[in-house]
């Protein structure tokens, strides 16, 4: 078996480290476009995702310090363009990219620019409803700003011819796609305002991709539409297409054909309206005549009611009613006076001195009885409390202890004696018994042997 020099043998760690250094030094930073998949955004703030195309994929990471500068929220399936460094994660030997910047690619970039311009113009108030102009009804002359060769112009003219052939139309031809298109659209709007030939404008084109419709997302076009003194109907693309011009315009039409219907009158509808107005006029006339007939009948009846004989009869009936009301009022007043007199008499009877004295005597007797009962209850409670206190006092009295055969001996200075060490032979002591005092003189002291042993100290060893 042949021997290899030790320097030619790699460990796994050394191999991964060498490959990482080669990738980072040789490749450096690169730009890479692809579709995002497996996007993960954990609580750490870092992003982990895969970039793929139809044939391959590569793992990517974007740390929090880098992704905080990204101006949009990435989504799975979104095409993006990233600037990244190629590296290798040594512990697992995984090859990956460390992204430092990210931006949308293709339509994604256009969509981001669309949202940014939309927010800017909305903040300036260009979309506010208060600035929207009302379309004339009916329009006297319509202006169309679109491509002269596009299908949108053909659709608009066809609808106008069908609905209102007598409506004049002025076309302001312009490019609707390409780098020069926004400026041409702006000039066409300004020209229409200078000539003042039309009282409403249709600005639009047929359908297409987001990039095809981009001229109508241009800020210059938006500001020209906002500044127009002539009301503008925005008609760009299909119903699902939305542009900045739709937000700024005075009215949005889903298609160019729909815009033509909005600014024109339908002849058949006009005929139906005329017929309807005629029917309403006839009905109004019939109603008016019927009202006048009813008014005549009412006045004739009132004239008959104003005959002098009828008026006299009504006044006599009214006089009878008034007389009856007067009698009723006098009877009511008399009854009220009688009831008031009875109430005053009852109150006078209640206020007589004898009645008040009798009630006061009854109240005094009741209070006297209550006071006597309260005093007796209080005396009984105090007697019970005194008896309990005396019993407790006798239980702790020294005299009670003496009655059981005990006595208390005191020294000449009055101090109570507890042991023989406090006594000196020859002293005169006082002993308190239950029924008196005894004075005695000490001749002999006889200590308790057990107490002497307790007080004796142990002898030291020689």
UniProtKB/Swiss-Prot annotation:
Catalytic reaction list: Exonucleolytic cleavage in either 5'- to 3'- or 3'- to 5'-direction to yield nucleoside 5'-phosphates
Enzyme class: hydrolase
A molecular-function term among this protein's GO annotations: exodeoxyribonuclease VII activity
Top-level division of the source organism's lineage: Bacteria
InterPro entries tied to this protein: Exonuc_VII_L (IPR003753), Exonuc_VII_lsu_C (IPR020579), OB-fold_nuc-bd_dom (IPR025824)
Subcellular location: Cytoplasm
EC number: 3.1.11.6
UniProt cross-references to CDD domains, sorted A to Z: ExoVII_LU_OBF
GO CC terms of this entry: cytoplasm; exodeoxyribonuclease VII complex
NCBIfam families: xseA
PANTHER family cross-referenced by the UniProt entry: EXODEOXYRIBONUCLEASE 7 LARGE SUBUNIT
Entry protein name: Exodeoxyribonuclease 7 large subunit
Organism, scientific name: Pectobacterium carotovorum subsp. carotovorum (strain PC1)
GN (gene name): xseA
């Amino acid at each position: 078996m042949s021997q290899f020099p030790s320097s030619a043998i790699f460990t796994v760690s050394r191999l991964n480290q060498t490959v990482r250094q080669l990738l980072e030094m040789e490749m450096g930073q690169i730009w890479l476009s692809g579709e995002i998949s497996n996007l993960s955004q954990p609580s750490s703030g870092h992003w982990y995702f895969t970039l793929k195309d139809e044939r391959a994929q590569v793992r990517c990471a974007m740390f929090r310090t880098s992704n905080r500068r990204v101006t949009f929220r990435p989504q799975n399936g979104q095409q993006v363009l990233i600037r990244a460094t190629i590296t290798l994660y040594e512990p697992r030997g995984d090859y990956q990219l460390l992204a430092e910047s990210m931006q949308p690619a293709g339509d994604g970039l256009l969509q981001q620019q669309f949202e940014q311009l939309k927010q800017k113009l909305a903040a300036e108030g260009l979309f506010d409803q208060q600035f929207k102009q009302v379309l004339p009804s009916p329009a006297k002359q319509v202006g169309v700003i679109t491509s002269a060769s596009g299908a949108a112009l053909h659709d608009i003219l066809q609808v106008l011819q069908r609905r209102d052939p007598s409506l004049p139309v002025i076309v302001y031809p312009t490019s609707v796609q390409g780098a020069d298109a926004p400026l041409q659209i702006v000039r066409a709007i300004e020209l229409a305002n200078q000539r003042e030939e039309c009282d409403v404008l249709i600005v639009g084109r047929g359908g297409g991709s987001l990039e095809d419709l981009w001229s109508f997302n241009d800020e210059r076009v938006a500001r020209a539409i906002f500044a127009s003194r002539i009301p503008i109907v925005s008609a760009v693309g299909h119903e699902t297409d939305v542009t900045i011009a739709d937000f700024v315009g005075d009215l949005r039409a889903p298609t160019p054909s729909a815009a033509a219907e909005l600014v024109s009158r339908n002849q058949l509808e006009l005929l139906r309206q005329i017929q309807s107005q005629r029917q309403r006029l006839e009905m109004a006339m019939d109603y008016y005549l019927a009202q006048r007939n009813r008014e005549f009948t009412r006045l004739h009846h009132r004239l008959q009611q104003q005959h002098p004989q009828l008026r006299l009869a009504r006044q006599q009936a009214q006089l009878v009613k008034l007389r009856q009301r007067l009698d009723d009022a006098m009877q009511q007043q008399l009854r009220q006076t009688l009831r008031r007199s009875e109430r005053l008499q009852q109150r006078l009877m209640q206020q007589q001195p004898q009645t008040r004295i009798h009630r006061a005597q009854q109240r005094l007797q009741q209070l006297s009885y209550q006071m006597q009962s309260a005093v007796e209850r209080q005396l009984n409670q105090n007697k019970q409390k005194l008896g309990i206190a005396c019993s407790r006092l006798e239980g702790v009295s020294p005299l009670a202890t003496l009655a059981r055969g005990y006595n208390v001996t005191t020294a000449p200075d009055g101090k109570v004696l507890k042991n023989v060490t406090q006594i000196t032979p020859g002293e005169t002591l006082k002993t308190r018994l239950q029924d008196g005092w005894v004075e005695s003189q000490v001749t002999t002291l006889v200590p308790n042997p057990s107490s002497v042993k307790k007080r004796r100290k142990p002898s030291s060893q020689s």
